[in-house]
Amino acid sequence: MRGILLAGGTGSRLWPVTRAISKQLIPVFDKPMIYYPLTTLMMAGVREILVITRPDDQRQFRHLLGDGSQLGLRLEYAVQERPEGIAQAFVLGAEFIGDQSVALVLGDNIFHGAGLGTRLRQYNDPAGARIFAYVVADPKAYGVVEFDEAGRAVSIEEKPARPKSRYAVPGLYFYDNRVLDVVHGLVPSRRGELEITAVNETYLKWGQLRVTTLDRGTAWLDTGTFASLVQASEYVRVVEERQGLKIGCVEEVAWRCGFIGNDQLRDLSRPLLKSGYGRYLLDLLADHEELKEVKPS
């Protein structure tokens, strides 16, 4: 499976903050926003990832992430000249996807929860499409999915006036390779965009749109407004300070997933020591070595 991280768009809901910088590069507490969706793909076992950016932003993303080799990844980049819908990501990424299945994550969506990576890895070779469902207070503001007890989608609507369920569809999607054919046949919506809901509707018609609920132990944070951005930062701060563990730490996730070894993690920590971020990485290694030295009684 290959991954696409969509970090384009104008970010106009966050202007003037995002007039000169990509939304996905602004901080969510102690990390750039893009670290969080990137680690979501990594936890799903995806190591080949296409990062789609605005033309003016690509240089900064390359400076931050490079080619991904330091994290055991292969990162490539594509430019979104104009934002023409979420499903445009598959048009821009068609050559990168090739004959593989693909996971798409939106660059302003943050997921966190115990066992999330284990669950995501179950779906990294989908037969059809896999979307996720999350209970929200106001489903009218989201894409809404209705599904049966077996996890088969029954209906899906974009911002319905009368929602058929309280389950919103977060910005994380898994598709088999037929998604490229689906997108090729899409007609732009009235707002001139290739809609991700239209992609999902096609799989629904085929009877191959599966739904996994994200339970109450999982947080889904959308950072598209000033208020939600502050809330996301506060959530990350509180969890990290109480648990002593970081959320969305790309170096830690690469290490825990086995993409890099101890020496690579140690090398990555050194330039980050002044902020305390590097000390956290070194402490992970120290704790790991301590556990290895403990002998069973």
UniProtKB/Swiss-Prot annotation:
Pfam families: NTP_transferase. Pathway: Antibiotic biosynthesis; novobiocin biosynthesis. The keyword Metal-binding applies. Binds 1 Mg(2+) ion per subunit. It catalyses: dTTP + alpha-D-glucose 1-phosphate + H(+) = dTDP-alpha-D-glucose + diphosphate. Keywords: Antibiotic biosynthesis, Magnesium, Metal-binding, Nucleotidyltransferase, Transferase. One of its GO terms (biological process) is antibiotic biosynthetic process. It comes from the Bacteria. Its EC number is 2.7.7.24. GO terms for molecular function: glucose-1-phosphate thymidylyltransferase activity; metal ion binding. The keyword Metal-binding applies. Its cofactor is Mg(2+). Mg(2+) binds at D108, D222. It is an enzyme of class 2 (transferase). Belongs to the glucose-1-phosphate thymidylyltransferase family. Catalyzes the formation of dTDP-glucose, from dTTP and glucose 1-phosphate in the novobiocin biosynthesis pathway, an aminocoumarin family antibiotic that targets bacterial DNA gyrases. This is Glucose-1-phosphate thymidylyltransferase. It comes from Streptomyces niveus (Streptomyces spheroides). The lineage of its organism: Bacteria, Bacillati, Actinomycetota, Actinomycetes, Kitasatosporales.
